[in-house]
Regions:
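Active-site pocket-lining segments that scaffold enzyme catalytic pockets across diverse folds
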Residues: 121, 125-185
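Segments forming glycine/polar-rich beta-alpha architectures that bind adenosine-containing cofactors
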Residues: 15-21, 25
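Structural signature of the thiamine diphosphate
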Residues: 340-349
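Active-site loops and adjacent core secondary-structure elements that bind or stabilize anionic groups
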Residues: 9-10
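Cofactor-binding active-site loop characterized by glycine-rich and histidine/acidic residues
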Residues: 161-334
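Single conserved hydrophobic/aromatic residue that forms the stacking wall/gate
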Residues: 1-6
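N-terminal structural subdomain of ketosynthase/condensing enzymes
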Residues: 29-47, 106-110, 190-215
């Protein structure tokens, strides 16, 4: 019974992942006791469920309470569509039987808070200092910074040598400063009206520019490369994946575990731009596969001028297109930075 309830909650819209409260909670008859020929009189009955909390006997009330803590909090999981039962089992063992897949001590929480302050502080400064300038800020998506921090640290601790990032304009300036390590003074100079570009280089707007740096992690130094990006949304994806493939070949990385791509998307472009479907379809092929990609979709619930899901796509979630390659999908409430970091840790594992 508990496993059935858990499986249904995996794929239903019951997690608290909408910080704006715009999505209506759907009624799911499958999750009602009566649907399974049970009543409140059965809540004290005990059941032993294989691979759930070490198969110990629990009351139905405790089983449901545990599953609700897992599947109705700030993290939502979609993995029951995956054909490989080992992957499904890994997720179930990882997330069920405890309120959250990870817990943080006070030092870790303080670090997450500091990164949020860094992210929000930059946006507030740019908004007040350059009020009329285009900057495509990260307001509302500040959790992206500690999320990327976690990906870099956790991949580095596992021996990854290079991370190649691709993203569009939204939040790019924040990532350049707070993740990539670009000097704030360089960015502020680019905002200045009297800024003169280097005549030996072609000009471009500041939210298109790439950057590279080396970041020290617990596993050693990791090279970060953020690809330059035009205004054509998602077109950078195959460029980043091609760069990763070349770097793997150069390193003789046949296991494809030394260079990892991280692609960041907007909700509307991820579900609508054809190049996304192309890179997904080619991702498992021998010629073009790179061993896996971390896709991060920052969903601000408005695609350009389209705010209603019914006008933007035909699927329930913008990430549903990734199901065609059996990719696990983790939804997270952007107002919960700790949950965002947990999602990053799950992605690395």
């Amino acid at each position: 019974i508990g496993r059935l309830v858990g499986s249904e909650m995996c794929i239903r819209d019951r997690a608290n992942i909408d910080p704006l409260g715009l999505r209506l909670k759907k009624e799911v008859p499958d999750l009602e006791l009566g649907f399974h020929n049970l009543s409140e009189n059965d809540l004290e009955s005990s059941f032993s469920i294989s691979n759930f909390q070490n198969s110990k006997e629990l009351s139905l009330k405790d089983i449901i309470s545990s599953l609700k803590k897992t599947y109705t909090a700030s993290l939502g999981y979609e993995f029951m569509h995956i054909m490989d039962s080992r992957i499904r089992r890994w997720f179930l063992d990882k997330i069920e039987g405890k309120p959250t897949p990870y817990s943080f001590n006070s030092d870790e929480q303080e670090h997450i808070l500091k990164r949020l302050v860094d992210s929000e502080g930059l946006e507030k400064f740019l908004a007040s200092k350059y009020p009329g300038a285009k900057r495509f800020g990260l307001e509302g998506g500040e959790s992206l910074v500690p999320l990327l921090d976690t990906l870099i640290e956790d991949f580095g601790s596992r021996g990854v040598k290079e991370l190649v990032l691709g993203m569009s304009h939204r939040g790019r300036l924040n990532v350049l400063i707070n993740v990539m390590g670009k000097k704030p003074s360089e960015l502020f100079t680019e905002f200045a009206e009297d800024f003169e570009e280097d005549e030996t280089k072609s000009g471009d707007v500041k939210y298109h520019l790439g950057f590279s740096s080396n970041i020290l992690t617990s596993g050693g130094e990791v090279h970060l490369a953020l690809g330059s990006n035009p205004s054509h949304l998602e077109i950078v994806n195959p460029v980043i994946l091609g760069s990763v493939k070349a770097r793997q070949d150069r390193r003789l990385d046949s296991a494809q575990d030394m260079v990892v791509p991280i692609l960041m998307h907007g909700d509307a472009s991820f579900s609508a731009q054809g190049v996304v479907m192309e890179i997904l379809q080619l991702s498992q092929t021998r010629a073009y596969g790179v061993g896996g990609t971390v896709h991060i979709v920052v969903n601000n619930q408005i695609g350009f001028t389209t705010s209603l899901k019914e006008d933007a796509r035909s699927t329930e979630y913008c990430t549903d297109v990734a199901k065609m390659i059996d990719a696990p999908i983790i939804h997270v409430n952007g107002d919960d930075p700790e949950a965002s970091v947990m999602a990053a840790k799950l992605a690395v594992e």
